[in-house]
């Protein structure tokens, strides 16, 4: 009898839960050995990876996949190099598991502190890019978690080949293969099953388009770490250094259009708009960026009219909306109303205004005189990230190794009794 999707996912979940207990107590040396061995296995399996990836690319071309998606799907030699390097870099990162902090004596004589421990089993749901398999697996492994990876159907052969290499590394380190499992069915029911198994899965991390993330957020019976959009703003304030503003805003938009930290809306204080916008527009237009502006913006530069929808839009493209605002309060109001609570930056030399902006803008990252594209785990010193969270529970901002752990209280006594004096 053919195994149903639900039975298959239950089997994966049960195996992951059992494996999570093993990886949670694995030593740092053992986890690092698995990561290094997985890197060696990837290096030795380049031909296998290329053949599996070509199967996915051929199917994608036959199914009319867009060129941009085919590019994201491709495992070029350089990308395989990057995956190998990524595994070795994660192996070199400090291990957060087992760290104890804030240990202190209480009046009763007991000691109380906090220990960092793995979350348990993490389900990762993602689209297109097979290198996410390595990113997710390596971070979960190093942080002492088991993981179930459900990639897009368009990358199924690539993901299987990558998972095989990871499991070779696990075996070499004496760890169970179920520490990292790839869902091998392309049936969409697998996603519904994965997000509905709180007895086996502790948290879900979705990485993909808005539709995928909205569905998972709505239907999941398991906690979700996510962000929906990256509608990031740069506000050029009254006391801005204009040259700094031109450089920061240009980099925030043009570093890479397709990242969630790219600036999508530029806000400019009315007191500097006339001196700032013409030169800013010239630089963007030379780069081929389409500008959409409010009425006050279009009185100063050539731009298409911005609609209400533009303020809500994550373009992920060479398009920028611009609004002239009355001042700091209106800029903060605009960001908190239209933004996605991801990353927002102020350009100013006025420390009081900078502090107000950072205190009142309700985003995972707030910046001063810094391009929003710096919102990245590597740039923050995390070494790597599994994604960026705009939630306030459990993690917020780039989620690295520490974000894949939680804390439990550690209490040490010597026979003290509550309600009685220590003997």
Curated annotation (Swiss-Prot):
InterPro entries: Ald_DH/histidinol_DH, Ald_DH_C, Ald_DH_N, Aldehyde_DH_dom, G-glutamylP_reductase_CS, Glu-5-SA_DH, GPR_dom. Signal peptide: none annotated. The keyword Metal-binding does not apply. Its EC number is 1.2.1.41. It comes from the Bacteria. Its main location: cytoplasm. GO terms for biological process: L-proline biosynthetic process. It catalyses: L-glutamate 5-semialdehyde + phosphate + NADP(+) = L-glutamyl 5-phosphate + NADPH + H(+). GO terms for cellular component: cytoplasm. PROSITE patterns: PROA (PS01223). Pathway: Amino-acid biosynthesis; L-proline biosynthesis; L-glutamate 5-semialdehyde from L-glutamate: step 2/2. Keywords: Amino-acid biosynthesis, Cytoplasm, NADP, Oxidoreductase, Proline biosynthesis. It is found in: Cytoplasm. GO terms for molecular function: glutamate-5-semialdehyde dehydrogenase activity; NADP binding. The keyword Ligase does not apply. Catalyzes the NADPH-dependent reduction of L-glutamate 5-phosphate into L-glutamate 5-semialdehyde and phosphate. The product spontaneously undergoes cyclization to form 1-pyrroline-5-carboxylate. NCBIfam families: PRK00197.1, proA. Belongs to the gamma-glutamyl phosphate reductase family. This is Gamma-glutamyl phosphate reductase. It comes from Pseudomonas putida (strain W619).
